[in-house]
Structures are given as structure tokens and as C-alpha cells.
Regions:
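PLP-dependent enzyme catalytic core of the Aspartate aminotransferase-like
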Residues: 15-16, 213
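Short, positively charged and aromatic/hydrophobic N-terminal segments
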Residues: 3-10
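Glycine-rich phosphate-binding segment of PLP-dependent enzymes
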Residues: 37-101
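Ubiquitous "structural anchor" signal
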Residues: 11-13, 121
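Charged, low-complexity intrinsically disordered tails and linkers
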Residues: 16-52
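Conserved PLP-enzyme active-site core in the AAT-like
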Residues: 22-29, 35, 61-62, 71-74, ...
């Protein structure tokens, strides 16, 4: 017996068929296809810039790997207590060189971003210190860490106070209010780069650098901590460069 071929049997087999015709066979009209092509063309320059930024940052990572001689040996497991874990130590050097920092802490035991932020906060703040958030309230997951929402073991329970300065209506830093908020107890300024779950714009490295310079001009010994979540490699420079 001979089975009759249906239309789906020949889809994509004719090399002369155009992309638009293939989409039409999938139920996408030529009008929709043309509209999509028009939008894609209008965004071409922007996406080319994204690609250039990605390539630039990829080269930075590759150079850091070459500098630290990443090899197959780095992927071998260690035994005992994990002292002198060659792969772990090399990975941290790669991160440090990529982001231009003195050192880096990259561990599988750090389970999430909130965990990493909590480590930085608890590692730098002591009873009597004050934490300042100049970009408004941080992520909801940090509320219990800081003590905005009551929680056992929070910074507030250990005697660390919290002060917050909301952004102006246009989404920019309120420098006058920040100046007034900084006092002798201010130990750490936490800057959340991403808008997170809010409607405000995310901050550029330039904006963050200007804020840090402003804060340091008022209190040079204050620690400026940047939550760079979702911001890595979207520019050619990072907050650690400013």
C-alpha cells in the first residue's frame, strides 16, 4: 500500500522555500512576519551593541582564566577538609581579576543571593553600627535579615540599626536626604543596582560611582556595598571599577 503524503511531510524539505513561507505553513501570516522583521530591524543597532559588550566581557573572563592558568587540574575533586582546594582558589582568583577586586569569595555553600548579601552584612556590621539604604527598601528577602520585618537572628536583634532614604519621584538618588541620613553611626551603605520587583529604573555604573563618591566625601571610612544582581556584564565596567 502507498501512504498519501500530507502537507506536514514536506515542511522544510524544499530548500527553495523562503523563511516567510515556512512561517505561513506554521500559521504565522505574512503581515505578522513583516511586522516582526520591521521591529527586529529597528533594534538591530541596539542588539549589536549588546553583542559587542558581551564579547568584550567574554574576553575579560578569558584573559583572567589565562592569567590564572585554568586547567583540567582545577576540576579535580579534593579530599579531607578542603584545605588548599586548587580549583576553588583558582576560581576565586579568576573572579577577582575579572571584577578587578582584591579578593573574592565564591563557594558552593552560598546558596543564593540573599545568603551572599547576609554574609557581607553580618561580616561588616557590629552592634551600634547603622546600615543605610540610599536607594529605598531592598529586596523583600532582606527584610528579615536586616530586621525590617521582625526575625530571630536579624541584624536588628544584634543591635544594628537601619535607616532608609527613598528615591525621588523621577527614580534618582535624593542626595540632600542622603547627606542628612549619614551620621557617626553609619558604617555601611547598601546600594541595590537592580530595580528588583519595583518600577524604578535600574542604576548604571556611572550613577553608582557618583553616589559612592558623594557618600565618601561626607564619611570617607564608610563601607559602600553594591548588590550587583542582574547587573554583571551588562556594561564594560562594573561597580567595583568605580
Amino acid at each position: 500500500s502507498v501512504r498519501r503524503r500530507n502537507k506536514s511531510d514536506t515542511i522544510g524539505k524544499d530548500h527553495k522555500i523562503t523563511m516567510k513561507e515556512l512561517y505561513e505553513q506554521l500559521g504565522i501570516s505574512s503581515k505578522v512576519y513583516d511586522f516582526g522583521a520591521e521591529i527586529e530591524a529597528s533594534l538591530k543597532e541596539r542588539f549589536e551593541q549588546f553583542d559587542k559588550t558581551a564579547e568584550y566581557n567574554q574576553l575579560k573572563v578569558l584573559m583572567a582564566m589565562q592569567k590564572n592558568k585554568v586547567s583540567a587540574e582545577c576540576f579535580q575533586s579534593s579530599s579531607g577538609y578542603g584545605y588548599d582546594d586548587f580549583g576553588r582558589d583558582t576560581l576565586e582568583k579568576v573572579y577577582a581579576d575579572t571584577f578587578h577586586t582584591e579578593a573574592c569569595l565564591i563557594r558552593s555553600q552560598i546558596t543564593c543571593g540573599t545568603h551572599a548579601l547576609a554574609i557581607a552584612l553580618f561580616g561588616n556590621l557590629r552592634p551600634g553600627d547603622e546600615l543605610l539604604a540610599p536607594a529605598g527598601k531592598p529586596y523583600d528577602t532582606l527584610e528579615e535579615v536586616i530586621g525590617i520585618r521582625p526575625s530571630r537572628g536579624s541584624l536588628a536583634e544584634y543591635g544594628v540599626t537601619y535607616r532608609q532614604v527613598d528615591l525621588k519621584e523621577d527614580g534618582t538618588f535624593d542626595y540632600n536626604s542622603i547627606r542628612k541620613a549619614i551620621n557617626e553611626k553609619t558604617r555601611l551603605v547598601e546600594i541595590q543596582r537592580s530595580k528588583g520587583y519595583q518600577t524604578r529604573p535600574s542604576f548604571s555604573v556611572k550613577q553608582i560611582g557618583e553616589l559612592i563618591s558623594f557618600v565618601k566625601s561626607i564619611k570617607p571610612d564608610v563601607i559602600c556595598m553594591v548588590d550587583n544582581c542582574y547587573g554583571e556584564f551588562v556594561e564594560r565596567i562594573e561597580p567595583t571599577d568605580v
